[in-house]
């Protein structure tokens, strides 16, 4: 027992484990003591006090060379501000990278000295510093120390000393960039702004040079006119007329001419008087025509065989009241081309400055939100880049290996919620890239003006039907060539920008094409969208506003297409380009000039109205034009605000392969237009999806805005130069209110041949139903229904009353 008691007494007390606060306090004390000791040691090294201070400094020099002071300062900052620096990862990383660059630069400078050139790097560096260390001196430049030598040696071996300088500079720039608050987007934006500034300066210099050339031409022309006027006055002053006979005394005139002419004018100068015709350019001919004067609108003497008779009427006699004295001084040789000046971009309102600086901060924030949102759903992605467009910003994300694409595409609603966006469109994947695009609407939509788009587009002026359509998400202007489409369907809900886009396409063509190169046929059942273009010389006929006339006008275009194909067959060419080439070759070698064929663009602003009135005729004409009109130089632009299957039928879609979809209300409408979803997520106001014939996926564009004032200015400019010259061959003529063709859907239809028989049957049985007529007369259900409608219109039977049978309003007469 005593032994047990002694054993219990010898057992010590159980030690208590320190708390976290106590451990942290102990660590803080240790850090404080360490920092204080290092500070004292580094202080002696900084001031090089005594042998100890010099030795400390030389030890640091051995590691980092002559950058010792920089690293001493960096060490002291880290000792006392390490908590703050832990939150600044980019600052620390940038400093380390910039320090590596400085070490390379210092060592490259050291070994560019003649005394160390071509010496072994590590051994020479160590010998320099160890010599000072052993002698307790600081005498020589140490470059980047042993650390700098280790980095410099492979770089100098691979890239030489000069290459090491360049790599060091790159490291320093990269380090400073990481230390700053700048982002990659800021650098890209700066480069883009600088590029735009240089381009604007170049364009301004180009305009100034053009203005100087024009001024020189004007001065030269003025001098020529003054010189010619002086010659004429000198000639008239030298002429002596016999008062009795009225004849010119040539001998005396020749004597007086030398005295009257100015000193710089000699007898061998240019002809005394040449008639100047302002409206046309004259073609060189030897002799004037010895016939009554005629004026040619173009350089065409006779039409090509088998052309329409309308094209032969190219010559107009002068009025009888023309003064003969004026005719004697006019050269009536055929004229090459009508002097027609194309409209300039100055007719359009200048661009308004756009400020999207707020979008940059929002983009940086959205990048973090996107990555965090995907991470919360267990999807590992990385945002590769972001492109700020006029209306949306496109984020290109790269999913990790093994992530299914549909997992990302199914999160559109969740992403819209996280980004507080109106809607989000996901393009999975981006065509041609191993990335997925997420399009988020901007907080402020930047309007793209027609002038801005025209100036930035790279459309070829020789391609008359190549027009700029809009700006892509990356800000680049996109153009399309209607000749390659070859037809275009434009659809979207009311107010989405459909009519503005059509006006932009028309204005683009008017900016490039003369009236003899492109002709328009415009159909506008709404009466307000295209009526502004009335009376321009590019129109074949006035803008058609009557839907019943429109179907006949389309049939006229079909007839023109057939006529052109017959002409191509007889000439032996395949398309309009080959035909016009033949015409140019013939005109170059013959005095009789022939007429090239213009391109024809048919524009329908509201297809739904036409389909309601005369669906069969309109659909047949559109299908025939869609199948064959491309080679004949005829192209269609069909616009509608009701993208339903009864308006855009399958046959129309098959023959109009290029489509533009503006904002629609549902995915069904989007599939009707594009055969895929996406248009229901558009923002309106010109935001569109463009799907050309040669691309499998639509491209999102922001269409240009062209105001009514801009359209009126360009139309007024064109009307001031030439008047409308309508072609009667395309005139649909007058159409009665009840005339809608055989397949229309309105008006009073023609009487069915079985109408009287059906009427007698109803009066005899005093019963009226479509099934009875179908059974008794052996007709189809559709025809029986039409007969019932005719009987109702004739007052034989009453209207339908739900499930009740129709009332027979007439009774049979004894004769019946």
Swiss-Prot record:
The keyword ATP-binding applies. GO terms for molecular function: ATP binding; ATP hydrolysis activity; DNA binding. ATP binds at residues 495-500. Its main location: membrane. CDD domains: TrwB_TraG_TraD_VirD4 (cd01127). Residues 475-671 form the FtsK domain. Residues 1-18 have a biased composition (Basic residues). Residues 1-20, 726-752 are annotated as: Disordered. Residues 726-737 have a biased composition (Acidic residues). Residues 180-816 are cytoplasmic. Homohexamer. Forms a ring that surrounds DNA. This is DNA translocase FtsK. It comes from Streptococcus agalactiae serotype III (strain NEM316). The gene is ftsK.
């Amino acid at each position: 027992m005593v032994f047990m008691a002694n054993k219990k007494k010898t057992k010590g007390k159980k030690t208590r484990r320190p708390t976290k606060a106590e451990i942290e306090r102990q660590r803080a004390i240790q850090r404080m003591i360490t920092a204080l000791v290092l500070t004292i040691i580094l202080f002696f090294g900084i001031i090089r006090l005594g042998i100890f201070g010099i030795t400390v400094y030389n030890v640091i020099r051995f590691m980092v060379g002559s950058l010792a002071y920089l690293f001493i300062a960096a060490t002291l900052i880290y000792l006392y501000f390490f908590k703050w620096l832990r939150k600044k990862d980019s600052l620390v990383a940038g400093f380390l990278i910039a320090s590596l660059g400085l070490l390379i630069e210092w060592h490259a400078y050291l070994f560019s000295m003649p005394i160390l050139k071509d010496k072994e790097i590590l051994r020479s560096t160590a010998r320099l510093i160890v010599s000072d260390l052993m002698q307790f001196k600081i005498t020589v430049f140490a470059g980047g120390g042993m650390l700098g030598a280790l980095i410099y040696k492979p770089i100098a071996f691979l890239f030489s000393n000069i290459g090491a300088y360049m790599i060091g500079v790159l490291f320093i720039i990269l380090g400073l960039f990481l230390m700053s608050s700048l982002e990659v987007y800021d650098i890209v934006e700066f480069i883009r702004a600088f590029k735009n500034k240089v381009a604007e300066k170049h364009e301004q210099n180009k305009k100034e040079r053009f203005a100087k050339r024009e001024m020189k031409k004007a001065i030269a022309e003025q001098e020529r006119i003054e010189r010619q006027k002086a010659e004429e006055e000198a000639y008239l002053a030298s002429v002596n007329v016999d008062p009795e006979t009225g004849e010119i005394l040539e001998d005396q005139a020749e004597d007086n001419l030398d005295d009257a002419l100015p000193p710089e004018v000699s007898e061998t100068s240019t002809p005394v008087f040449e008639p100047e015709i302002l409206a046309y350019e004259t073609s060189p001919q030897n002799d004037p025509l010895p016939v009554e004067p005629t004026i040619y609108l173009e350089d065409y003497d006779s039409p090509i065989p088998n052309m329409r008779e309308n094209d032969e009427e190219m010559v107009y006699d002068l009025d009888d009241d023309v003064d003969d004295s004026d005719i004697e001084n006019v050269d009536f040789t055929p004229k090459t081309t009508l002097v027609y000046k194309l409209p300039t971009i100055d007719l359009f309102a200048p661009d308004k400055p756009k400020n999207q600086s707020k979008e940059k901060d929002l983009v940086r924030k959205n990048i973090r939100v996107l990555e965090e949102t995907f991470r919360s759903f267990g999807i590992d992605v990385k945002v590769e880049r972001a492109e700020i467009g006029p209306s949306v910003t496109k984020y290109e994300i790269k999913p990790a290996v093994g992530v299914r694409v549909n997992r990302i595409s199914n999160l559109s609603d969740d992403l819209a919620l996280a980004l507080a966006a109106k809607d989000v469109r996901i393009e999975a994947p981006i065509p041609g890239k191993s990335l997925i695009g997420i399009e988020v609407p901007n907080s402020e939509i930047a309007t793209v003006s027609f002038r801005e788009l025209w100036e930035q587009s790279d459309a070829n002026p020789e391609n008359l039907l190549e027009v700029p359509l809009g700006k892509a998400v990356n800000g680049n202007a996109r153009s399309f060539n209607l000749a390659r489409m070859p037809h275009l369907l434009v659809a979207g809900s009311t107010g989405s920008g459909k009519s503005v886009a059509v006006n932009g396409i028309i204005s683009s063509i008017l900016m490039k094409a003369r009236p003899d190169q492109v002709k328009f046929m415009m159909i506008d059942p709404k009466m307000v969208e295209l009526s502004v273009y009335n009376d321009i010389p590019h129109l074949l006929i006035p803008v058609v506003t009557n839907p019943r006339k429109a179907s006949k006008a389309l049939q006229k275009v079909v007839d023109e297409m057939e006529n052109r194909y017959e002409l191509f067959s007889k000439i032996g060419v395949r398309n309009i380009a080959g035909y016009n080439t033949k015409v140019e070759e013939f005109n170059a070698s013959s005095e009789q000039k022939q007429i090239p064929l213009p391109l024809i663009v048919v524009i329908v602003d509201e297809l739904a109205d036409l389909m309601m009135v005369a669906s069969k005729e309109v659909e047949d004409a559109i299908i025939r034009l869609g199948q064959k009109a491309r080679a004949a130089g005829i192209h269609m632009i069909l616009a509608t605000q009701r993208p339903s299957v009864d308006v855009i039928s399958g046959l129309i879609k098959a023959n109009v392969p290029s489509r533009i979809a503006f904002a629609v209300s549902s995915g069904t409408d989007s599939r009707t237009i594009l055969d895929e979803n996406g248009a229901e997520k558009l923002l309106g106001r010109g935001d569109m999806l463009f799907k050309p014939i040669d691309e499998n996926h639509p491209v999102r564009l922001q269409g240009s805005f062209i105001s009514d004032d801009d359209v009126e200015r360009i139309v007024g400019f064109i009307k001031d130069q030439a008047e409308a010259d309508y072609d009667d061959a395309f005139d649909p003529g007058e159409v009665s209110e009840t005339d809608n063709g055989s397949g229309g859907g309105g008006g009073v239809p023609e009487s069915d041949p079985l109408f009287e028989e059906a009427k007698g049957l109803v009066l005899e049985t005093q019963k009226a139903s479509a099934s009875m007529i179908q059974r008794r007369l052996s007709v189809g259900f559709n025809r029986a229904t039409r007969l019932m409608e005719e009987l109702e219109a004739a007052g034989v039977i009453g209207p339908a009353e739900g499930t009740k049978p129709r009332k027979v309003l007439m009774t049979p007469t004894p004769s019946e």
